[in-house]
C-alpha cells in the first residue's frame, strides 16, 4: 500500500524521532510512505481570516500534488494535519476561497479538495487495523502506564477533523492497548498545553502544561505520548510539575513494540 506523505518542517529537525520511527514502523506493517516532492512549510497554524489566502497556498500545493499521484495524503505532526485538513475543507466547501487560491496557483488542473487527508493514527486504525498492529508486536509494552496527550489541534474543529470524538477520544488509548501498554485516562488529555502562547507569554504555557502534567501524574501515568512536536516541547520544557513525566512521540513506542527502534 502506497500513501503520499507530508512530514512538515519540524520532523526534519527537532522531531526527527517522530518521523524516523513512523517510517520504520509502517515498513514493518507493509505500508509505504512516499514523501511529496518539494513540499513547503504549511505555516504551522490555520488562519481563521477568510481572506487570508497566501499563507495557505503551500498546503494547497501539497494537497494537489497528492491528488495528481492518485494517493491519499498521510500526515503526522498535529499542527500540519490541522492546517492541511482545514485547508482541504476550505478548498472543497468554500467557493470564493477556492477560486482565489486556484487563481494564485494557476495549476494545470484546479484543485477542489479531492485529496483525502488522514493522520498516521487513522492509518493504523482504519487501514492497517489495530488488530494487525497487535499481531505484529514482538515487544509488548506490558506494565507501562501511558497517558495519551491529544492537545488541541489533533481533534478540533471536530466537524472538519473527523478523527474521533474531540471531547472523549479513544484512538490513542486503543493504539496503546494494541502495543501492549496500559492507557491512563485523565481529564486534561485534550486540553491545551499553551501552544504558541509560549512565544509571547511563557507563563501561560507553563500554567497549561503544568496542569496537564500534574493531572496525568495524579492518575498514575508513568509517561505521556503525543503526536505534536509543540506539545512535546511545552510539556518537556515549560512544565513546572512536581512530578515531571517523560514525554515521547507515540511512534517511538510503536517502533519499540514492533522491534524496529534502533
Predicted regions and their residues:
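Iron-sulfur cluster-binding electron-transfer modules in prokaryotic oxidoreductases
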Residues: 1-262
Amino acid at each position: 500500500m502506497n500513501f503520499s506523505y507530508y512530514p512538515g518542517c519540524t520532523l526534519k529537525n527537532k522531531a526527527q524521532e517522530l518521523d524516523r520511527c513512523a517510517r520504520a514502523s509502517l515498513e514493518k506493517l507493509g505500508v509505504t510512505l512516499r514523501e511529496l516532492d518539494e513540499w513547503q512549510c504549511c505555516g504551522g497554524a490555520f488562519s481563521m481570516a477568510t481572506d487570508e489566502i497566501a499563507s495557505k497556498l503551500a498546503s494547497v500545493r501539497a494537497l494537489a500534488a497528492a491528488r495528481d499521484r492518485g494517493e491519499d495524503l498521510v500526515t503526522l505532526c498535529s499542527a500540519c494535519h490541522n492546517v492541511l485538513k482545514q485547508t482541504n475543507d476550505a478548498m472543497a466547501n468554500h467557493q470564493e476561497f477556492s477560486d482565489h487560491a486556484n487563481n494564485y496557483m494557476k495549476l494545470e488542473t484546479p484543485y477542489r479538495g479531492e485529496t483525502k487527508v488522514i493522520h498516521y493514527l487513522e492509518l493504523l486504525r482504519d487501514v492497517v487495523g489495530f488488530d494487525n498492529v497487535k499481531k505484529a508486536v514482538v515487544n509488548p509494552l506490558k506494565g507501562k502506564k501511558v497517558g495519551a496527550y491529544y492537545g488541541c489541534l489533533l481533534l478540533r474543529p471536530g466537524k472538519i477533523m473527523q478523527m474521533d470524538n474531540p471531547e472523549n477520544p479513544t484512538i490513542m488509548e486503543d493504539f496503546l492497548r494494541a502495543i501492549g501498554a496500559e492507557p491512563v485516562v485523565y481529564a486534561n488529555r485534550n486540553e491545551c498545553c499553551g501552544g504558541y502562547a509560549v512565544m509571547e507569554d511563557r507563563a501561560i504555557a507553563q500554567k497549561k502544561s503544568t496542569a496537564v502534567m500534574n493531572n496525568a501524574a495524579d492518575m498514575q501515568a508513568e509517561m505521556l505520548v503525543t503526536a505534536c512536536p509543540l506539545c512535546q516541547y511545552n510539556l518537556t520544557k515549560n512544565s513546572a510539575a512536581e512530578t515531571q513525566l517523560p514525554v515521547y512521540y507515540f511512534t517511538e513506542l510503536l517502533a519499540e513494540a514492533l522491534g524496529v527502534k534502533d
